[in-house]
Design a protein with these regions (language model features):
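Glycine-rich loops and low-complexity Gly/Arg-rich segments
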Residues: 190-194, 214-215, 234-237
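Conserved donor-nucleotide binding/catalytic region of nucleotide-linked donor-dependent transferases
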Residues: 220-240
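Nucleotide-sugar donor-binding catalytic core of glycosyltransferases
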Residues: 1-207, 211, 243-261
Length: 262
């Protein structure tokens, strides 16, 4: 059984930390708590599991390692391996993904974005253009972390009611929303600054997502996609999620990469 040396960070107990709980509940892994801000896999503690959004924060430095699996920013180095990424609340997403998701005809929102700008880095990637002009259901509040318009359950349900969903850079080039869109089969509209290539299994344009450079391109792009094309993309998104970001899929991927680079 794979052993994970995990750190305990109560204020950040979501995303990968919540996924670790799910791996443990399913008896995929054995865990042991360690001090610090990083997680390790394997008995020798040689495999770094870097789930943090950035690698350049002086208060959260990357320690020495033999092989590192990186979820968001992936440094350009042979010891740094593209991994997968995680929803903000994997348990809630797992629950809605396991339900009967709305079909094409039942999705009454054509395009959607729900988010927030909480820091200058997010502002640079999200406020550089007026994305609200290209999205039918657009909500983005500005300011420090705090209350949101929707509960986490409402947010995921609403996301699943849309045919297309805009992705914008987060605190890193990937965002939890990217994975949430794939999970509920809402076809991503990928904006500049988003990284969809630095995964173990990269996203493929016009298979998993459509790409735009400006808000003005969005309506023409999504209008050109037929119902049958959307269904194919919807299914490809969900299959990618199952292979790479679901509870079982993310564990099998992690196990595969550790075995490959031992």
């Amino acid at each position: 059984m794979l052993k994970i040396y995990r750190c305990d960070i109560p204020q950040h107990h979501d995303s990968f930390l919540e996924m670790l709980d799910m791996w443990e509940e399913r008896r995929y892994v054995e865990t042991e708590y360690v001090d610090g801000h990083v997680h390790w896999a394997n008995e020798e503690k040689t495999f770094l599991l870097w789930h943090w959004p950035r690698v350049d924060e002086p208060w959260r430095q990357v320690p020495p390692f033999r092989i590192g699996l990186f979820g968001n920013v992936v440094p350009n180095h042979p010891q740094c391996i593209p991994w997968t990424f995680f929803a903000r609340s994997p348990k809630r997403l797992d629950k809605i993904v396991s339900s009967n998701l709305p079909s094409y005809g039942e999705r009454n929102i054509n395009s959607i974005f729900m988010g927030k700008v909480e820091n200058q880095i997010q502002a640079a990637g999200r406020n550089n253009q007026d994305w609200s002009t290209g999205i039918d259901d657009f909500y983005m509040s500005q300011g420090s972390p705090g209350s949101y318009k929707y509960t986490k359950e409402q947010y995921l349900e609403r996301l699943s009611q849309a045919k297309f969903g805009l992705t914008l850079p987060g605190y890193g080039p990937k965002c939890n929303r990217d994975i949430e869109l794939m999970g509920v089969g809402t076809v991503p509209i990928v904006a500049p600054g988003c990284d969809v290539e630095r995964y173990d299994e990269p996203w493929v344009e016009n298979i998993h997502y459509i790409r735009v450079e400006r808000p003005e391109e969005i309506q023409d792009k999504i209008s050109s996609i037929t119902k049958s094309q959307w269904k194919e993309m919807h299914n490809e998104c969900r299959m990618w999620y199952n292979r790479n970001a679901s509870t079982e899929g993310s564990f099998k991927l992690t196990e595969k990469l550790i075995e490959k680079y031992k």
